[in-house]
Amino acid sequence: MDLEKFSAAAEAIGVLGLKVSQHGTVIAHKTWDEECRRNVYSASKSVTSCAVGFAVQEGLLSLEERLVDAFPQDLPEAISENLERATVRDLLTMCLGQEHGELMGAQRPLYKERDWVKLALSFPFTDAPNTKFVYNNVGPYLAGVLVQRRSGCDLVSYLTPRLFEHLGIVRPTWEIDPLGRTFGAGGLF
């Protein structure tokens, strides 16, 4: 492969950065406008999933842990059977059992409740977990909050030595909720 031609073609179509590894060794690395931060929007969800993977590996949480055990102080007064059965795994697969995608971008400024964890757990769990996919921000958000609570730090601090440094990502920032918790469903820059 001609890396110079590939790099020129990538730049021509608006690629923001390029890193090529061969047999575990970086053989080409180029960024255009390195100082500019860009929101990766919902790709943030994948980074939050990495945080959960590290936390599982470190014994901080389990994918089979039920949400009622993970968030006991945040539960609504009435706990449905579906909420009772929902697990951390269901957060990551977006098969939580909630009928609608919640905590989406246009919705967030409209919420009067500042504690989005309590709000997210109060939305109806209309379906049995792991039976229906509904794209949402609730799952990745709650998964990120759980990692933050168990690790004792925000997601950027948790992921910097585990992921960001290894990828050469410097000074990442992340959107936060009204109470200052990282919004793991989006807003990673």
Task: List each language-model region with its residue ranges.
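Active-site helix/loop module of the DD-peptidase/beta-lactamase fold
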Residues: E58-Q98, S122, R150-G186
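Active-site SXXK
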Residues: G24, N39-E64, L91, A143-V147
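Amphipathic alpha-helical interface segments
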Residues: Q107-P129, G139
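Solvent-exposed loop and edge beta-strand segments that line ligand/cofactor-binding
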Residues: C36, V40, I79-N82, A128-Y135, ...
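Flexible glycine/proline-enriched surface loops and loop-helix/loop-strand junctions
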Residues: D33, P124-A128, G139-Y141, D177-G184
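Short alpha-helical patches at coil-to-helix transitions and adjacent helical residues
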Residues: A43-S49, R85, Y135-P140, L188
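A short, well-structured edge-of-sheet supersecondary motif
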Residues: L3-E34, L63
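Acidic-glycine-rich active-site phosphate/pyrophosphate-binding loop
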Residues: V15-H29, K112-A120, F164-E175
